[in-house]
């Protein structure tokens, strides 16, 4: 049966408002949107919950520039800027030893740019090493699916090489030569304490 409007105009069905049929794309379940920081934060939360280690991510320092006080009892920050962090991302205690490390990730597949680090971070890590702390860097090559644990004493020569006019990056093969690869799992997600046990205890 044909449906029409008064005056003889034909009715045509409109699909507006109906859900459109989308082409299904395959779902991948591996590391969906997880960053290195997310993985490490989940890992250290697991360590803490299971009394394995006490490691925390340091908050990023913020400089507050302008504050508004709409009421006497409340304040509203109107303008603030991230300060350059003066030390590393993570620190804590494991098996009675002080642990301090910086974590970086890259989308590169052939090398890691040293511009991701700052002089003051290198100075801080060198000072921790002098005090016999466990200090290292964790570098994730996201596209390769590789995460590397590098003791600071093995990483620092690459920084010195750059400072004296050499390469401004570290090749993946150089990193593989001096690092311990961190396995990716469920709980803990990135068990970097395995590397500490292997290299320091």
Swiss-Prot record:
Catalytic activity of the protein: Endonucleolytic cleavage at a junction such as a reciprocal single-stranded crossover between two homologous DNA duplexes (Holliday junction)
Top-level taxon of origin: Bacteria
CC annotations in GO: cytoplasm
GO molecular function: endonuclease activity; magnesium ion binding; nucleic acid binding
Protein's UniProt keywords contain DNA damage: yes
Enzyme class of the recorded protein, top EC level: hydrolase
Positions bearing the site annotation: Transition state stabilizer: 104
Pfam families: RecU
BP GO annotations: chromosome segregation; DNA recombination; DNA repair
Binding annotation for Mg(2+): 87, 89, 102, 121
Keywords: Cytoplasm, DNA damage, DNA recombination, DNA repair, Endonuclease, Hydrolase, Magnesium, Metal-binding, Nuclease
Cofactor: Mg(2+)
Family: Belongs to the RecU family.
Task of the protein: Endonuclease that resolves Holliday junction intermediates in genetic recombination. Cleaves mobile four-strand junctions by introducing symmetrical nicks in paired strands. Promotes annealing of linear ssDNA with homologous dsDNA. Required for DNA repair, homologous recombination and chromosome segregation.
Protein name per its UniProtKB record: Holliday junction resolvase RecU
């Amino acid at each position: 049966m044909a449906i029409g409007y008064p005056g003889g105009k034909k009715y045509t069905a409109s699909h507006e408002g109906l859900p459109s049929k989308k082409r299904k794309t395959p779902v991948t379940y591996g590391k969906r949107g997880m960053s290195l920081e997310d993985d490490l934060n989940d890992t250290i939360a697991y360590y803490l919950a299971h009394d394995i280690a006490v490691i925390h991510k340091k908050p990023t320092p913020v400089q507050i520039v302008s504050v508004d006080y709409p009421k006497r009892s409340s304040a509203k920050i109107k303008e603030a800027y991230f300060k350059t962090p003066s030390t590393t991302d993570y620190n804590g205690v494991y098996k009675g030893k002080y642990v301090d490390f910086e974590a970086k990730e890259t989308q590169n597949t052939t090398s890691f740019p040293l511009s991701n680090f700052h002089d003051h971070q290198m100075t801080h890590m060198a000072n921790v090493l002098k005090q016999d702390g466990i200090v290292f860097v964790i570098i994730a090559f996201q596209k390769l699916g590789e995460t590397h644990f590098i003791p600071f004493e093995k990483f620092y020569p690459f920084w010195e090489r750059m400072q004296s006019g050499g390469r401004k990056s570290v090749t993946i093969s150089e990193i593989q030569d001096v690092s311990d690869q961190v396995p990716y799992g469920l709980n803990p997600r990135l068990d970097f304490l395995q590397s500490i046990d292997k290299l320091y205890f």
